[in-house]
């Protein structure tokens, strides 16, 4: 899975205090499952799809707007279909907030993600894993 590390980099680019204190951002993969048709191509390739929830926990944070903006911008580039499925406002990013003192919050955001993996036989044995069209990009903040 390569999207979690990329989203972390994008959040750090948008919120510099996460670079200064990286312990304030925790990312965990939860509720994961793999799907596949099991079909084998003429070249022997098989593919599968990671489906999971990436939970971003921002600790002792002073506002929710910046993380949500960074995540929505990232999703627009890396999970466009997810954003398009939200049209009508009936779905979105689940989140929870623990309100602390002095205007600080702990913010937990659940982000449903997918990543396709193609597994092809490698010359000389072994397997090559490719994540097509899953080269995550960090949009300009």
Language-model regions, residue ranges each:
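Long, contiguous binding/interaction regions
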Residues: 1-49, 57-141
């Amino acid at each position: 899975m390569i999207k979690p590390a990329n989203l972390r980099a994008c959040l750090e680019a948008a919120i510099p205090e996460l670079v200064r204190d990286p312990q304030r951002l925790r990312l965990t993969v939860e509720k994961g499952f793999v799907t596949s048709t099991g079909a084998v191509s003429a070249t022997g390739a098989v593919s599968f799809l990671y489906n999971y929830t990436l939970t971003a926990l921002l600790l002792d944070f002073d506002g929710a707007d910046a993380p949500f903006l960074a995540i929505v911008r990232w999703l627009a580039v890396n999970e466009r279909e997810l954003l398009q499925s939200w049209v009508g406002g009936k779905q979105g990013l689940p989140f929870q907030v623990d309100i602390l003192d002095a205007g600080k919050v702990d913010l937990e955001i659940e982000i449903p993600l997918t990543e396709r993996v193609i597994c092809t036989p490698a010359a000389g044995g072994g397997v090559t894993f490719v994540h097509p069209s899953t080269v995550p990009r960090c949009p300009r903040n």
